[in-house]
Amino acid sequence: MASYSIILSVGGTSINKYPGKQHARRVAAYLPKHQGLIYLPGQQTVLSEDSDQARPFKQRRYFFYVTGVVEPDCHVTYDIAEDKLTLYVPDFDFKRTIWTGPTLGKDEASQRHVEYYSSLEGDVQRWSQGNPSSPIYILHPDQRPVTPLTVAYLYESKSLKHAMDACRVIKDEHEVQLIQRANRVSGAAHRSILANLRHFKNEAQIAGLFIDVCLSLRSKGTAYETIAGSGSNGATLHYTRNNEPLAGRQMVVLDAGAEWSCYASDVTRSFPIPSSVRGGGDWPSREAEQIYTIVQRMQEECISRVKEGALFFSIHQHAHAVALEELLKLGILRIPRGSTKADLIKAEATALFFPHGLGHHLGLEVHDVSPDSGTIPLDLAIACQNGLMSVTEHRPPCTLSAPPLASGMVITVEPGLYFNRLAINQAREERDKPDSKGRFVNFDVVERYVDVGGVRIEDDVLVTKNGNRNLTDAPKGREMLDLIYGR
């Protein structure tokens, strides 16, 4: 009966390509004991509440890392001493195959041992009986493969996540290729939007075309919810409603990235709305061009500093230094009488306009794991309470405690400047307080820039031994403008 199950869906173009077993070996080398059994469950099929329809499937990333399998309802074990990776697949169901088509079966066992799920409990019992002093490594205490009955299982849930995070943060060449493939799809989608922008009337058309291009190029979709914010919506860091008209607005912030074989891209471009440009030129206002130029400089200088051994926190600080210099030139920031530039820096006044971290790790998750983070990865581009984030409140790699950048890391570099009305009003209300950011802001000048909304430019960058390699090819700068205006 197993012959009915003939399709194996894995990352890459063939079953042999994704280096899952090599990943399992790397993980084992980081564990405290070089013997034991690693167990990881894949994502199970889950029905929506009060429905017979399954929720959209997203494979568990730790499971995928050692298998490359994107089928639901699977499990995997890795016997460290025997170097044996065993994939457990759902028991064959003829009726299910008639309804949903062939799925993963035992016959597709190239470079891995495959069993049906019904044998998992017995296999674990036999392994534990034969290795009574060796641990079964699990990610979380509630992810045990079987309920203990007569066997005293030795579960260990403290080491596996740290070991897997240490491995996942350094990408091998195959993983880099998948991230680059995701970026190529993203680049094609961004190009299509720029070329058609003059025909669009609303944000939904921008977001819709991005998804359309991703799917047409055989991506499974986007790595995260698309952000297509026009005008003041571009000043909301994670604006995802994408349902407002473009008319009367100057700029769009498009933060959108494709996924390829479970690997993410994360790309942001900011561009002028052609219908808002009057009397020739490329920009709807001098202010929009000025802010774009500043952010472009911030990104270019920060990317040039990305290399093995560099501290990302220092690069993040450089982005703020550039912002400080340029915002002082424009008169947006000021040094009041009795104060110094050092006071402005101490107050972190630039965080009013640049309220997020410079970037984050990228990989199987868009906000990927950090080395030995011990926590679920958090988005560095999320504002803290009151819409402002201190430069000391970011998560890795934007922290003083984060380790230096290492070859094989993939990080985003995404500086931005935003004129968020809520944040500006709050700073104005608090400007008389001695420790406020508002003391250093010229609010009359700021009003000229509010209609710009926001500008963010984001690329995905591979750290190499000799510097870095930019994996993102979505147009920006002059190439972006030429596409918009058909030149």
From Swiss-Prot:
GO terms for molecular function: manganese ion binding; metalloaminopeptidase activity. Its EC number is 3.4.11.9. It is an enzyme of class 3 (hydrolase). InterPro entries: Aminopep_P_N (IPR007865), Creatin/AminoP/Spt16_N (IPR029149), Creatinase/aminopeptidase-like (IPR036005), Pept_M24 (IPR000994), Peptidase_M24B_aminopep-P_CS (IPR001131), X-Pro_dipept-like (IPR052433). Pfam families: AMP_N (PF05195), Peptidase_M24 (PF00557). Transmembrane segments: none annotated. Keywords: Aminopeptidase, Hydrolase, Manganese, Metal-binding, Metalloprotease, Protease. GO terms for biological process: proteolysis. Mn(2+) 2 binds at residues 255, 266, 458. Its cofactor is Mn(2+). PROSITE patterns: PROLINE_PEPTIDASE (PS00491). It catalyses: Release of any N-terminal amino acid, including proline, that is linked to proline, even from a dipeptide or tripeptide. Mn(2+) 1 binds at residues 266, 414, 458. Binds 2 manganese ions per subunit. Belongs to the peptidase M24B family. Catalyzes the removal of a penultimate prolyl residue from the N-termini of peptides. This is Probable Xaa-Pro aminopeptidase MGYG_06974.
